[in-house]
């Protein structure tokens, strides 16, 4: 993983963890296991794709997965709206050279194993590599 991919993911994770501290139990880089896996809702952020557009510009595709045990999906919907606002705020305050506000590319709802329900938000962005 490129150094700035990691830096972007770390900044976004911190922004979501602090901005959603009253709504979620945590933000993770992979699905938690053990006792953490039974405390809902939580967010998992994954890098789906990243590639160089040219020598200076890199494309990053992130999947933000909201995992909940609310079968109606209302909890995930509420959190996803807040995520959009938090990403907009992150874009306006970051010191990284992001070339435009993260774009929501796709949204999917999925029933997971056990009683988990998830909403998957696919965000894309381009940035200048330093």
Q: Where are the regions a protein language model picked out?
A:
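Conserved beta-strand segments that form the floor/walls of ligand-binding pockets within enzyme
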Residues: 44, 65, 122
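Small/polar-rich, solvent-exposed N-terminal microdomains that initiate assembly or binding
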Residues: 1-54, 74, 85, 90, ...
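Short, charged interaction patches at domain edges and termini
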Residues: 1-14, 47-57, 98-130
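Short, conserved charged micro-motifs
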Residues: 71-78
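Short amphipathic alpha-helical coupling segments at ligand-binding clamshell hinges
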Residues: 79-83
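Short beta-strand-to-loop capping motifs
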Residues: 66-70, 125-127
